């Protein structure tokens, strides 16, 4: 009899929870329509995988890419609508959040065609790979719109869990297993520290979890200058620092870049930074409004360490992916300048513009590394010597992306850095901008060193990998060529006419 009553109570409670979830989705679903499209794509992928055979593999790519493109379209149709807070304060929809969501979707859309040839050659499980990519994208999008601590914690964990699984996707590779272990352990530790910081803010504000309500709570409790806020600031900076991977929170980055499958590295190298940057701008600017001097100082230290260590250590690397890992650490130092400048002096606009260019430059470089690695089986920088003699198209496109990463005019990277540094200079960050300019010159050195190897024609310098290189024919159905071409064009042309891009970024009201 007791069991019967308990069973009935369980059914009633489950029904209430289901009805509440259905009610929220019915009345608030339009606010997360782009995310709902991705969820539908995930369900469709699972259904087709259960009911189809290996001959239907092209459908998996088509469904994933279509879901992402439709989600981008839904975001564009929603552009410039009034800011809305939905799901009982958990989620905020505005232009600032949406432009970061657009960048994440753009990264994923370009990464899927970049991965097709790699998956086919290595015989990786395609369905799980695409499921993890879409789920990580979903987590990143929710993080961009998160408006309370629970969502800010759950969304990046969704992204991180998929990232761990993707980085260890080649289970028989010892380097991949080592990278995944480090990534998982450090990710778990950073999440714990992040939650510790949230708990201090929660207690100091009188039990508030929404970002704006925390500010009001700190005013009411008069705790906005208390030692607890300083502890919260340091803890949250460490937690977010792991996601952004600036120095000294970069220890996992080189190993994960070197050990993970190259398409996975391409995906993680941009999406994680975009999502973490979106979260960092809102967390630092709203709950820590009264501690702006303190978090500005912390971020300045991180930016200086990242720009110096990242670019100097990159010079000594012999692995292409490991070099790009340290290069990305230096690049995030430039992005932090935009976060520090903030809404004044177009800091956020310059940061968003530079991140758009960084996506194209970085993914274009990784597309070439994927193509070269599949044909030679090597990642050593010396093995790229003389590639121009065998595959001029690959060598030239790789050179353009590297030059754009270095910031040489008239490529997109130059104009992106120029506007970012100019905004920092106007905000009075003279020392930070000077370090950025000097380290940019250093980065040009190691990029030009690689380009010199690419263009060499000396037989004694050309390795057997290039001598036996099989050139990939340019075909209209070669997805990696399409992805690479889009990235190369986006790394060059937009820099010449970047005013429209800046205008769009400036329209993103915080």
Curated annotation (Swiss-Prot):
Its main location: plastid. It is a multi-pass membrane protein. Signal peptide: none annotated. One of its GO terms (cellular component) is chloroplast thylakoid membrane. It catalyses: a plastoquinone + NADH + (n+1) H(+)(in) = a plastoquinol + NAD(+) + n H(+)(out); a plastoquinone + NADPH + (n+1) H(+)(in) = a plastoquinol + NADP(+) + n H(+)(out). It is found in: Plastid, Chloroplast thylakoid membrane. NDH is composed of at least 16 different subunits, 5 of which are encoded in the nucleus. This is NAD(P)H-quinone oxidoreductase subunit 2, chloroplastic. It comes from Phormium tenax.
């Amino acid at each position: 009899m007791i069991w019967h009553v308990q069973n009935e109570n369980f059914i009633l409670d489950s029904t209430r929870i289901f009805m509440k979830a259905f009610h929220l989705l019915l009345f608030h679903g339009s606010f997360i329509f782009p995310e709902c499209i991705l969820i539908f794509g995930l369900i469709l992928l699972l259904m087709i995988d259960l009911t189809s055979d290996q001959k239907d593999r092209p459908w998996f790519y088509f469904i994933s890419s279509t879901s992402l493109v439709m989600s981008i379209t839904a975001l564009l149709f929603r552009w410039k609508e009034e800011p809305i807070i939905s799901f009982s304060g958990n989620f905020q929809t505005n232009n600032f959040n949406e432009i970061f969501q657009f960048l994440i979707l753009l990264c994923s859309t370009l990464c899927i065609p970049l991965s097709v040839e790699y998956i086919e050659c290595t015989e990786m499980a395609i369905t799980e790979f695409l499921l993890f990519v879409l789920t990580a994208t979903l987590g990143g999008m929710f993080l961009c719109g998160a408006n309370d601590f629970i969502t800010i914690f759950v969304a990046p964990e969704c992204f991180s869990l998929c990232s761990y699984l993707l980085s260890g996707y080649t289970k028989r590779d010892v380097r991949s297993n080592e990278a995944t272990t480090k990534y998982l352990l450090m990710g778990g530790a950073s999440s714990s520290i992040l939650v510790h910081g949230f708990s201090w803010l929660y207690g100091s504000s009188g039990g508030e979890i929404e970002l704006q309500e925390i500010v009001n709570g700190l005013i009411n409790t008069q705790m906005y200058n208390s030692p607890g806020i300083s502890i919260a600031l340091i803890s949250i900076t460490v937690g977010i620092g792991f996601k952004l991977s600036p120095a000294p929170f970069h220890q996992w980055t080189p190993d994960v870049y070197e050990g993970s499958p190259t398409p996975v590295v391409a995906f993680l190298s941009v999406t994680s930074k975009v999502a973490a940057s979106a979260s960092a701008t809102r967390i630092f600017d709203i709950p820590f409004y009264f501690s702006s001097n303190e978090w500005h100082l912390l971020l300045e230290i991180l930016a200086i360490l990242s720009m110096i260590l990242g670019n100097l250590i990159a010079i000594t690397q012999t692995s292409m992916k490991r070099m790009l890992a340290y290069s990305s650490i230096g690049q995030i130092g430039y992005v932090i300048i935009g976060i520090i400048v903030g809404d004044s002096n177009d800091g956020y606009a310059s940061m968003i513009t530079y991140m758009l260019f960084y996506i194209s430059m970085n993914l274009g470089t990784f597309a070439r590394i994927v193509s070269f690695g599949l044909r030679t089986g090597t990642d050593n920088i010396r093995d790229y010597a003389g590639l121009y003699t065998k595959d001029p198209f690959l060598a030239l496109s790789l050179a353009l992306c590297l030059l754009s990463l270095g910031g040489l005019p008239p490529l997109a990277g130059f104009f992106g850095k120029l506007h970012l540094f100019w905004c920092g200079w106007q905000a009075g960050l003279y020392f930070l901008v000077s370090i950025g300019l000097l380290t940019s010159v250093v980065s040009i050195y190691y990029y030009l060193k690689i380009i010199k190897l690419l263009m060499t024609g000396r037989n004694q310098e050309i390795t057997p990998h290039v001598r036996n290189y099989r050139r990939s024919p340019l075909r209209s159905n070669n997805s990696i060529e399409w992805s690479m071409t889009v990235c190369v064009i986006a790394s060059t042309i937009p820099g010449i006419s970047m005013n429209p891009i800046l205008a769009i970024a400036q329209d993103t009201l915080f």
